Amino acid sequence: DGGGGTVWDSIVYDEVNDSVIFGVGNGSPWNRDHRDAGKGDNLFLSSIVAVDASTGTYKWHFQTTPGDNWDYTATQHIMLADLTIDGAKRKVLMQAPKNGFFYVLDRQTGELISARNFVQTTWASHVDMETGRPVETPQARFAEAPSFALPSPFGAHNWHSMSYSPETGLVYIPAQEVPFVYGKDPEFKYAPGYWNLGVDASLAAMPEDQAVAQQLAAMIKGRIIAWNPVTREEAFHVEHPGPWNGGMLSTAGNLLFQGTPLGQFL
């Protein structure tokens, strides 16, 4: 048994369509095998959902990570914007959730306009634009053996706010790459009042082999990514010493501000 799907961050109001749009969290336990023997998509986990603001009636949804298995929430910040795409003005929403893909959706219908990874993703190669589903790699669900993965449960982007500048047309994402090893917990039993992950978290510990540990440590990165949502590519990035940096502020004077875990204000 299981559940999850908490709405703990982004909730926005779209006054044009009189919609409340919110991002939905991960599955609990993380490992879908402990939630759903049928191995379904588990709606509405890891989804963006729109409801009528006046009645609460469901309008549409888009699921970023069907059958979530990795703690890949879609609760990260939802931004509303007007973008010119293929010569047409579109009223869109944008999100860079934990799973490492940057999404642009039509905010009236939920239609997927674009999706592309903004960091390295080992769990999925790309998003199928016909179905909107990520194309998972063979080892992604760690069904037979533990799987090395990027992003980790920390996410490619977490609760630290991204920002959008209409002046530059860029979205500024406090992104990170933190490797993780997912594997089944063969002794998992649900325990009320505890984190019920259903994965063996000890697999993610740093190995005793110092050479391997140093190699893994070198893979841990934090950066500002300036993302162009129209061309679907990175415009530039700024490297940080490590991950878990603060939210972004962009100004009309084309300045960027951000705090770091080391107490610096940039």
What is the role of each PLM region?
Residues 1, 34-74, 81-89, 101-149, ...:
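Extracytoplasmic/lumenal domain signature
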Residues 1-9:
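Solenoidal tandem-repeat scaffolds enriched in leucines and small polar residues
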Residues 6, 15, 43-44, 73-75, ...:
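Short, solvent-exposed loop/turn segments at the edges of secondary structure
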Residues 9, 76, 160, 245-246:
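Structural signature of WD-repeat beta-propeller blades
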Residues 12, 145-148, 154-180:
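Long, low-complexity segments enriched in small/aliphatic residues
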Residues 12, 79, 163, 249-250:
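Conserved beta-strand position repeated across blades of beta-propeller domains
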Residues 16-18, 90-91, 168-169, 253-254:
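Short coil/turn segments that connect the beta-strands within blades of beta-propeller domains
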Residues 22, 95, 173, 257-258:
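Residue position within the beta-strands of beta-propeller blades
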